[in-house]
Design a protein with these regions (language model features):
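Hot-dog-fold acyl-thioester-processing enzymes
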Residues: 1-55, 112-142
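HotDog/MaoC-like acyl-thioester-processing domains
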Residues: 1-3, 60, 64-66, 77-142
């Protein structure tokens, strides 16, 4: 999935750059687009499941400034028995080319909304998650 963000004044903090907390918003926005594009949210609701982030590991590589144009990309990295991990990048696009300004690994589980407990990732859910492994052409190799 790909989300485009142009940095405006409301993204900037008192130090004239994008605060680290904003990166999390950009990452989450792309994950929502990622799930919406594949109708995953409706499927999860129908199956009484909630996707919950349990760990986010973010690397801040370069600062982001007013006027920067960013692309956020997401792909599934690993599917385990009870959790899965997606990999994300924020890429700055400028006249000189593109560069990664941040990357992140997000680990998440699925909660059964009836029992309020994490579930084992069964074959059906694994198939749905495997669809998110495609579309990695926009990534920049680190």
């Amino acid at each position: 999935m790909t989300t485009h963000v142009k940095i405006h004044g409301y993204h900037i903090d008192v130090f004239q750059h994008v605060n680290n907390a904003r990166y999390l918003e950009f990452y989450e926005a792309d994950r929502w687009e990622w799930m919406n594009k594949r109708n995953f949210i409706n499927w999860a609701i129908k199956n009484n499941l909630t996707m919950a982030a349990v760990n986010i590991n973010v690397n801040y590589i370069q600062g982001v400034l007013l006027g920067d144009e960013l692309t956020v990309v997401t792909r599934m990295d690993k599917i385990g028995s009870k959790s899965a991990v997606c990999y994300q990048q924020i890429i700055r696009n400028n006249a000189g080319g593109s560069e990664v300004v941040s990357d992140a690994y997000v680990t998440f589980v699925f909660i059964d909304n009836i029992t309020n407990k994490a579930i084992v990732i069964d074959d059906e859910l694994r198939e749905k998650l495997a669809l998110f492994k495609s579309g990695t052409d926009d990534f920049i190799q680190n």
